[in-house]
């Protein structure tokens, strides 16, 4: 259970675990939005002051990477990892593995977006989307941080849907390699695609 109360809509203290394209890119976007962001790399560090934790590690080193971080105490957590290889024993999704280690309300988000495009989000006429799944207690915070990164949140369901999101990596890469290249996406209701 989370020991942290976060003021949704206000500045949050965010610890990003992983300084690669995803973690580093989101850290920059959230800093620009006014959040207090600390980025931790392979050396680990302390997350005790964080309201929210983002996990952006390679799937094979999630447990090892999180073991190097002290102060993980049930914070709201966003898991942005993707599966490459087999799932860890005992877990149906990487998000469940992350939740078992950190212990707080968890969401799966940002794993279906191309980090290479983060710096182009603001140039878009319409906000691109981000699919996410979330524990109820993490939903409002996750939606706010998705918006603060420049995307529109698209809710898929509770954290039980995380594996479905993780399975999209093959489709996402396939579409990109098929000729489209890195892309934004958006889902709309009927009538919303008409010219504005």
Model-derived regions: residue spans:
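NAD(P)+-binding Rossmann beta1-loop-alpha1 motif at the extreme N-terminus of oxidoreductases
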Residues: 2-45
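Rossmann-fold NAD(P)-binding glycine/threonine-rich loop
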Residues: 81-122
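Hydrophobic residues within alpha-helices
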Residues: 26-27, 98, 142
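General beta-strand structural signal in soluble alpha/beta enzymes
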Residues: 39-40, 105-111, 154-158
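Hydrophobic Val/Ile/Leu positions in short beta-strands of Rossmann-like dinucleotide-binding domains
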Residues: 14-16, 55, 132
């Amino acid at each position: 259970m989370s020991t942290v109360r976060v003021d949704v809509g206000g500045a949050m203290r965010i610890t990003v675990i992983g300084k690669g394209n995803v973690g580093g890119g989101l850290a920059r976007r959230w800093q620009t939005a006014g959040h207090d962001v600390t980025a931790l790399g392979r050396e680990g560090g302390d997350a005790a002051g964080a309201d929210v934790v983002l996990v952006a590690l390679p799937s094979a080193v999630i447990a090892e990477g999180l073991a190097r971080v002290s102060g993980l105490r049930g914070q709201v957590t966003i898991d942005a990892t993707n599966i490459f290889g087999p799932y860890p024993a005992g877990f149906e999704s990487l998000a469940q593995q992350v939740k078992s280690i950190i212990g707080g309300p968890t969401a799966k988000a940002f794993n279906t977006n191309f980090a290479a495009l983060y710096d182009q989000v603001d140039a878009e006429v319409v906000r691109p989307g981000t699919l996410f799944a979330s524990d109820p207690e993490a939903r409002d915070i996750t939606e706010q941080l998705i918006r603060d990164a420049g995307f529109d949140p698209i809710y898929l369901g509770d954290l039980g849907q995380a594996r479905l999101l993780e399975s999209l990596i093959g489709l996402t890469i396939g579409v990109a390699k098929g000729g489209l290249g890195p892309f934004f996406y958006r889902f709309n209701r009927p009538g919303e695609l008409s010219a504005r």
